[in-house]
């Protein structure tokens, strides 16, 4: 049994979010939640929210036992980028790219 939860258009770069995702991939959900709770990174808060949602989906929709769940897969895909302009000296302008992520967490009982 596999249950997933998604957070699309998360306002963090995929590169930063993958650092957090790599730490919890394949772990039991209790251990993963513990790691995310004490992580100082902003992306950890976003990933923890999605993991909590996946656990709730498994419990409510499938009747799964929380103690047996593991983080089966966690994928961080690149979302659309927002282009912004930063004024610079002598009438020039630089482009700022604000990146977004699509966070997908799959929990399974295997």
Swiss-Prot record:
| One GO term (biological process) | translation
Q: Which PROSITE patterns does this UniProt record tie to the protein?
A: RIBOSOMAL_L22
Q: Which UniProt keywords apply?
A: Ribonucleoprotein, Ribosomal protein, RNA-binding, rRNA-binding
In which domain of life is the source organism classified? Bacteria
- GO MF term (any one): structural constituent of ribosome
Gene Ontology cellular-component terms for this entry are:
cytosolic large ribosomal subunit
Checking SUPFAM superfamilies in the record gives: Ribosomal protein L22
Ribosomal protein keyword on record: yes
> What family classification does the UniProt entry report for this protein?
Belongs to the universal ribosomal protein uL22 family.
User: Record's HAMAP family?
Assistant: Ribosomal_uL22_B
Q: What is this protein called?
A: Large ribosomal subunit protein uL22
- List the gene name: rplV
